[in-house]
């Protein structure tokens, strides 16, 4: 009834051919780190493949996502679930977690990351994920984590049903076995989403801001903090900057600085939505640079 101990296997090198030609768009995407909790990861040998490579690949993706202003969302199941709440899951997997609920240390959430409680296979079920995606105007989901043929596949299916493009990272997920892993990727690539390697995903993300010289959401946050004589921690990327004291003169000064670094954004666009997150999304959307795989 419990999750079986998982034998070591290598992450697949050859990925299935996608039926769709979707590309990751940093202004539309969210990175999901799915169920990378100590409880689930401990069924693997953490010193043997696929875990070392899986962790490295998710770290690489997260670094690229942060640089490009892509939000990062974590899911995690709670401990000591009420049997009535857990319901049919208990028939397949027993009572669930009693401890080890934390995300593994190498992938621990950082300030600004979103953390959601997860109750079912799909990250969408009984969670605010769908509402949050719609509120933030995001309609792409980059999916990493465990287990590919259970939560990853279910989440990709639900994303597709909700008109959110799922991108499953073929070497950024792990499963009970190589055969389960490969089955999941074949199904997703042919029926419900796009499968990318970590390298492909990072290239597509990086291509969209390669025109920018040293400009990122983080550097813009520092620039705004300096202009308003605030600490960086006081500048929330989703807060209306007018409430923090931004005026048109300082907005123009910031605009000129960012244009010199390659940003394509007008003063009218700057003042239409006065948050750093929305400014960065506009800059990303205006790049119009073809993606490369």
From Swiss-Prot:
* A GO molecular function held by the record: isochorismatase activity
Cofactor binding, note field: Binds 1 phosphopantetheine covalently.
Provide the Carrier domain boundaries.
Answer: 211-287
* Pathway(s) served: Siderophore biosynthesis; vibriobactin biosynthesis
Where do the coiled-coil regions begin and end? none
Catalyzed reactions per annotation: isochorismate + H2O = (2S,3S)-2,3-dihydroxy-2,3-dihydrobenzoate + pyruvate
Keywords from the UniProt entry: Hydrolase, Phosphopantetheine, Phosphoprotein
Give the UniProt family note.
Belongs to the isochorismatase family.
What is this protein identified as? Vibriobactin-specific isochorismatase
Q: Which organism is it from?
A: Vibrio cholerae serotype O1 (strain ATCC 39315 / El Tor Inaba N16961)
The uppermost taxa in this organism's lineage are: Bacteria, Pseudomonadati, Pseudomonadota, Gammaproteobacteria, Vibrionales
Q: Supply the gene name.
A: vibB
């Amino acid at each position: 009834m419990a999750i079986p101990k998982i034998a070591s296997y290598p992450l697949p090198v050859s990925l299935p051919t996608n039926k769709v030609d979707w590309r990751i768009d940093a202004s539309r995407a969210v990175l999901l780190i799915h169920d990378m909790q100590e409880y689930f990861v401990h069924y693997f040998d953490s010193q043997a493949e696929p875990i070392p490579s899986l962790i490295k690949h998710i770290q690489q993706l997260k670094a690229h996502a942060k640089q490009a202003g892509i939000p990062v969302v974590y899911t995690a199941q709670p401990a000591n679930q009420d049997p009535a709440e857990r319901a049919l899951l208990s028939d397949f997997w027993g009572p669930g977690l009693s401890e080890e609920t934390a995300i593994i240390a190498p992938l621990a959430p950082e300030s600004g990351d979103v953390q959601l409680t997860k109750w079912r296979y799909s990250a969408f079920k009984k969670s605010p994920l769908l509402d949050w995606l719609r509120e933030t105007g995001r309609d792409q989901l980059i999916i990493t984590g465990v287990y590919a043929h259970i939560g990853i596949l279910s989440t990709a299916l639900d994303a597709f049903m909700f008109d959110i493009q799922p991108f499953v990272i073929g070497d950024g997920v792990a499963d009970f076995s190589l055969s389960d892993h490969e089955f999941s990727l074949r199904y997703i690539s042919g029926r419900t989403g796009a499968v990318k390697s970590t390298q492909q995903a990072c290239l597509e993300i990086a291509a969209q801001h390669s025109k920018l010289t040293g400009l990122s959401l983080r550097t813009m946050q520092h620039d705004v903090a300096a202009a308003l004589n605030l600490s960086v921690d006081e500048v929330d990327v989703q807060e209306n900057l007018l409430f923090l004291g931004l005026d048109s003169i300082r907005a123009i000064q910031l605009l000129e600085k960012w244009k010199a670094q390659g940003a394509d954004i007008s003063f009218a666009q700057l003042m239409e939505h006065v948050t750093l997150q929305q400014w960065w999304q506009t800059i990303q959307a205006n790049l119009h640079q073809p993606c490369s795989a």
